């Protein structure tokens, strides 16, 4: 079952972003993943504004692929640069529908 990673970042230093973008996409792809979006155009519609200045959504075939990506030694220097350049939150969700009302999703 597909899983999604939601990366929320509040940038304090964006000097790492270009290098990260140029090098991390192939590492994501190596683990079967792909970026669905990566944007600095963040608008809070409801709830607390946490000051996120960059949000990315990635899709992977399964949770094991996310773990393999995150622990890949090739990714380590880019992950460290990202962590040093802002406040980060990475969340993983699966592709279920907890109430069973979305016709194209698997019920939980």
Q: Residue spans of the language-model regions?
A:
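Short S/T/G/P-rich N-terminal loop/turn motif that feeds into the first structured element of a domain
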Residues: 1-71, 94-108
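C-terminal structural segments of small proteins and small subunits
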Residues: 76-91
């Amino acid at each position: 079952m597909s899983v999604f990673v939601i990366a929320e970042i509040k940038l304090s230093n964006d000097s790492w972003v270009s290098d990260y973008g140029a090098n991390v996409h192939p590492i994501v792809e190596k683990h079967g993943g792909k970026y669905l979006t990566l944007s600095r155009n963040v608008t809070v519609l409801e709830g607390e504004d946490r000051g996120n200045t960059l949000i990315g959504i990635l899709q992977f075939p399964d949770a094991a692929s996310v773990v393999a990506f995150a622990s890949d030694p090739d990714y380590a220097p880019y992950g460290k640069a990202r962590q040093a350049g802002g406040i980060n939150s990475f969340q993983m969700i699966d592709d279920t529908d907890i109430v069973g009302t979305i016709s194209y999703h698997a019920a939980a």
